[in-house]
């Protein structure tokens, strides 16, 4: 709602449900708002599956990401597609420098994510009163229908012990390897890599196709369902294209259902009762569509002035970069975040 104010994409739907569109004087009623509180936003569904694999999936090797499975190769391909996407959207950091990726694990975009994770760690340590007893393990636990098959539980880094000092707490996180270090001159902590953070604190809790599940079992599949047809639909055009373009490669690997490609293609061709395509509806739901010049909808809505984005940085239901991209896009758009 904070980004889609007065968007024409919603007009047909509002008229269809009989929403008030004009006041008593015949003036158009506006629906833009002043500010938005965003808690763990599940957005950017056009690239959410690719973002999940780039941020988390590429560092996993069990379940649907096990070697020899077609879904492992699909994960790698989605990761590569996300690199392309990042370089297309040309986000800038707060200093005005463009963020790019030179590979799946390198580039200024990667470095910026790493710095965000480090900032969160240092803020947590400075804001927390020690002795400290965590309420849960760092990695959390898979939950819901999206829990990955065969992946097991993520590593329990904190054991619900009480830590007397910040250094004691960091020592527990470094119990199996040293991936967090302290700068003796500044007192700040840094992490060795995004991969280390993911493996210790943010393991993937969903299978490949984290949002547009191959079996159409995720809540997002229901979101794009067509009431008069079936209740769930595929919506990820990146996955649809990969399943079609790389069918010969995937067919040589395990766990491929030959119907996947056809199902994605068929679902993406369906329109709803107002003649809107799945892609149009994905755009409606995507803040980046309105905020970034890569998309046709750039500057087509009245965006709120103020935003606050809150999220659990270690939760495995979505990638860190969805929220990070939203922050950067809003900042690049001139909004207060």
Language-model-detected regions and their locations in the chain:
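C-terminal subdomain of alpha/beta-hydrolase-fold enzymes, centered on the catalytic histidine
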Residues: 137-337
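Short, surface-exposed, polar/charged, turn-prone segments marking secondary-structure boundaries
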Residues: 16-17, 63-68, 335-336
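Non-catalytic, alpha-helical, charged scaffold/linker segments
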Residues: 39-41, 47-226
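Structured segments of extracytoplasmic/periplasmic soluble domains
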Residues: 4, 39, 124, 294, ...
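Primarily recognizes the serine-hydrolase "nucleophile elbow" in alpha/beta-hydrolase
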Residues: 1-59, 138, 146
